[in-house]
UniProtKB/Swiss-Prot annotation:
It comes from Vitis vinifera. This is Small ribosomal subunit protein uS8c. One of the primary rRNA binding proteins, it binds directly to 16S rRNA central domain where it helps coordinate assembly of the platform of the 30S subunit. Belongs to the universal ribosomal protein uS8 family. GO terms for cellular component: chloroplast; ribonucleoprotein complex; ribosome. Keywords: Chloroplast, Plastid, Ribonucleoprotein, Ribosomal protein, RNA-binding, rRNA-binding.
Amino acid sequence: MGRDTIADIITSIRNVDMDRKVTVRIASTNITENIVKILLREGFIENVRKHQESNKYFLVLTLRHRRNRKGTYRTILNLKRISRPGLRIYSNYQRIPRILGGMGIVILSTSRGIMTDREARLERIGGEILCYIW
């Protein structure tokens, strides 16, 4: 049985975010690097470093926590894995769901790489729905 690396990084980020820690270390693959680039571009992550440890590469993510008078609160509220190895979910560009009326993002795997729902609608291509972030 294979590992679901996307579910692993989603779970790692969710656990660290709920624990109110700042950094998380995840395994580095092409898919995880592309998803992390999207999270960095959308403002959910402050910083990304690539770390090597005995011929294995890891990504060290610094999560963004906002501050107010009462203390810190989380930026990422929910991450949900949609398409999984046992049940793949595909969508064309017209039927890509809108999360919270466009406030959240959908990460898709398309023929042109991993992108957000807005980019996929602009390029008029569909693909596999990997996860929701809102």
